[in-house]
Amino acid sequence: MAKEDSIEMQGTVLDTLPNTMFRVELENGHVVTAHISGKMRKHYIRILTGDTVTVQLTPYDLTKGRIVFRAR
């Protein structure tokens, strides 16, 4: 998936799921399941419930995404 094809949205982490998956509520109210990007995993960036994150969504499946940034 090329970067141009993805949709980036802001959201809040609602719940932590097994295998570094998270339930994220987007700004528009939709709830998606998201996993951590490889660079965040590599640098041991922790994500907790309530964190504000940036999620990349693919236009093909809007129910799954990738967390690419955690706001401070």
Swiss-Prot record:
Gene3D superfamilies: Nucleic acid-binding proteins. SMART domains: S1 (SM00316). Its main location: cytoplasm. One of its GO terms (molecular function) is translation initiation factor activity. Residues 1-72 form the S1-like domain. Disulfide bonds: none annotated. It is found in: Cytoplasm. InterPro entries: NA-bd_OB-fold (IPR012340), RNA-binding_domain_S1_IF1 (IPR006196), S1_domain (IPR003029), TIF_IF1 (IPR004368). Pfam families: eIF-1a. Keywords: Cytoplasm, Initiation factor, Protein biosynthesis, RNA-binding, rRNA-binding. GO terms for cellular component: cytosol. Component of the 30S ribosomal translation pre-initiation complex which assembles on the 30S ribosome in the order IF-2 and IF-3, IF-1 and N-formylmethionyl-tRNA(fMet); mRNA recruitment can occur at any time during PIC assembly. One of the essential components for the initiation of protein synthesis. Stabilizes the binding of IF-2 and IF-3 on the 30S subunit to which N-formylmethionyl-tRNA(fMet) subsequently binds. Helps modulate mRNA selection, yielding the 30S pre-initiation complex (PIC). Upon addition of the 50S ribosomal subunit IF-1, IF-2 and IF-3 are released leaving the mature 70S translation initiation complex. Belongs to the IF-1 family. This is Translation initiation factor IF-1. It comes from Idiomarina loihiensis (strain ATCC BAA-735 / DSM 15497 / L2-TR).
